[in-house]
UniProtKB/Swiss-Prot annotation:
Its EC number is 4.2.1.11. It comes from Exiguobacterium sibiricum (strain DSM 17290 / CCUG 55495 / CIP 109462 / JCM 13490 / 255-15). Keywords: Cytoplasm, Glycolysis, Lyase, Magnesium, Metal-binding, Secreted. Pathway: Carbohydrate degradation; glycolysis; pyruvate from D-glyceraldehyde 3-phosphate: step 4/5. The gene is eno. This is Enolase. Mg(2+) binds at residues 242, 287, 314. Its cofactor is Mg(2+). Binds a second Mg(2+) ion via substrate during catalysis.
Length: 430
């Protein structure tokens, strides 16, 4: 046992220049942990609350001094004295103190900061890597990355409706080689886009954000880049998409407005559109294919293509075990996106991953569009043997920080390290 002796939070900036929370935890035996909390752009309406100040005279109302004060003045006095190794106890105490289902009292950004920093302090005190402390000595699977190389939707100022077009180097023998493949394709894509006279500026998550004629053109230019880099689509590399359809769903009309393509589709038409894309292109994963509240649409999509495509619930499940349990019961989707700040504690994050695996769902550990240099999610992916990670493109230090941490972990694990590649899609019949 080692008691927590000090907890301190401050306001810092994330990758979009918006304030976020940083927390430091100190223990009596010299343990130290620091955690930086991420934030999202497209957020599910059922996510845990990210507490912002709302004071328009500071950071356009996006300051987090209230959350910082909640750590320093309200949570710290209650958590100081806890055994730093009692992660579940620390997290439960903070949930109980908050007293709301969505952490709306203190803010998930306050609670998560302490949760992650405490884990880091515990690992530091034991002299263990974070992934080993969290996952034990069975933590050895490096995740197959989803690399976001074309940004659209709310992540970019262009006319592409779908939010993310990603590559997954499933044919690589190691994570190191997977990263190399991704980087080479990223640079090949820049060359392809430049040759077409298109913009090669990048979006929030480091992917390119060109104005393209359609969502389908985003797919075809990526396929061209894969070939240009010397790889084979559908063998070495598969495609993945985060549609983020809640962002273009017209609730009043019950229709999906693909403004970039000038199309308004019913749920049935949208599902058929996905089915046609999957038949035509090597797409292995689709995230949030329907609106977060269009559960009938998600069921239709799952029944239509769920046997051969990973269907990931992000806004649909918001890393929440209650939502996930409902989805499992109804046979909706076959995968969950795991975002630590959607739920607000490490304990609840691990519970969601465990529930998914027991039900035969895959789990994809994910970043947010507003990130920092914090690399905790890389350790979480390995600690839980999740098998997949989504942490942006092959540019911007806030994204590369996670990839570099995974390289270090693979190095530390040495011959014990496992990279599953295509095997990480264990529930598909593709």
């Amino acid at each position: 046992m080692s008691m927590i002796t000090e907890i301190y939070a401050r306001e810092i900036l994330d990758s979009r220049g918006n304030p976020t929370v940083e927390v430091e935890v100190y223990t009596e035996d010299g343990g130290f942990g620091r955690a930086l909390v991420p934030s999202g752009a497209s957020t599910g309406e059922h996510e845990a609350v990210e507490l912002r100040d709302g004071d328009k005279s500071r950071y356009l109302g996006k300051g987090v001094l209230k959350a910082v004060d909640n750590v320093n003045e309200k949570l710290a006095p209650e958590i100081i004295g806890y055994d730093v190794f009692d992660q579940a106890g620390i997290d439960k105490k903070m949930i109980d103190l908050d007293g709301t289902k969505n952490k709306g009292n203190f803010g998930a950004n306050a609670i998560l900061g302490i949760s992650m920093a405490a884990a880091r302090a515990a690992a530091d005190e034991l002299g263990l890597p974070l992934y080993t402390y969290l996952g034990g000595f069975n933590a050895k699977t490096l995740p197959t990355p989803m690399m976001n190389i074309i940004n659209g939707g709310s992540h970019a100022d262009n006319n592409v409706d779908f939010q993310e077009f990603m590559i997954m180097p499933v044919g690589a023998p190691t994570f190191k080689e997977a990263l190399r493949m991704g980087a080479e394709i990223f640079h090949a894509l820049k060359s392809v886009l430049s040759g077409m006279g298109l913009n090669t500026a990048v979006g929030d998550e480091g992917g390119f954000a060109p104005n393209l004629k359609s969502n389908e053109e985003a797919i075809t230019v990526i396929l061209e880049a894969i070939e240009k880099a010397g790889y084979k689509a559908g063998e070495d590399v598969y495609l993945a998409m985060d549609v983020a359809s809640s962002e273009f769903y017209d609730k009043a009309a019950g229709k999906y407005n693909l403004a970039g393509e000038g199309k308004v589709l019913s749920t049935e038409e949208l599902v058929e559109f996905y089915a046609q894309l999957v038949d035509k292109y090597p797409i292995i994963s689709i995230e949030d294919g329907c609106d977060e509240n269009d559960w009938d649409g998600h069921k239709l999509l799952t029944d239509r293509i769920g046997h051969k495509v990973q269907l990931v619930g992000d806004d649909l499940f918001v890393t929440n075990t209650e939502k996930l349990a409902e989805g499992i019961e109804k046979g909706i989707a076959n995968s969950i996106l795991i975002k630590v700040n959607q739920i607000g504690t490490l304990t609840e994050t691990f519970d969601a991953i465990e529930m998914a695996k027991k039900a035969g769902y895959t789990a994809v550990v994910s970043h947010r569009s507003g990130e920092t240099e914090d690399s905790t999610i890389a350790d979480i992916a390995v600690a839980t043997n999740a098998g997949q990670i989504k942490t942006g493109s092959l540019s911007r230090t806030d994204r590369i920080a996670k990839y570099n941490q995974l390289l270090r972990i693979e190095d530390m694990l040495s011959d014990v390290a496992v990279y599953d590649g295509i095997k990480s899609f264990y529930n598909l019949k593709k």
